[in-house]
Amino acid sequence: MRIRVGFGFDVHQLVEGRELWLGGVLLEHTKGLLGHSDADVLLHAVCDALLGAANMRDIGYHFPDTAGEFKNIDSKILLKKTVELIASKGYKVGNIDATICAERPKLKAHIPLMQETMANVMGIDVDDISIKATTTEKLGFTGREEGISAYATVLTEKD
């Protein structure tokens, strides 16, 4: 068995008038993330990590923000397509370790549903997805609540 590791990162600006999607879950908040799609930074970071592990470039290459077909698209669809892309090269998801950086909303109570949602989309076990939430102690753009970022590391396997 061959294993490969990938790393992904994404960040989007918080703005009024948008829904806040994280980990495929709609969260109640006064602001949402600005982006061409639903701007789910966690799913985008995971997509980039998976594509990186398979040496298949990045999310912007496969799902460009210049393409109308991806305007306001549900990022769960992008994640499913990404899993299919890496499967075309013989890779499957081993496990995911991700961190979301946000001052608000508090995310602890939402993490189990994010894990369940992502596991269902990818066809993997919930125990193979670790999601953590942290703040930047009020430092930088995240601390000023101007945006939310996410980091993801994945392990992929190929027989």
PLM feature segments, named:
Residues 2-112, 121-122:
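RNase III-family endoribonuclease catalytic core
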Residues 118:
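Glycine-rich, mobile lid/loop segments that gate access to catalytic sites or pores
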Residues 142-159:
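C-terminal edge-of-domain segments
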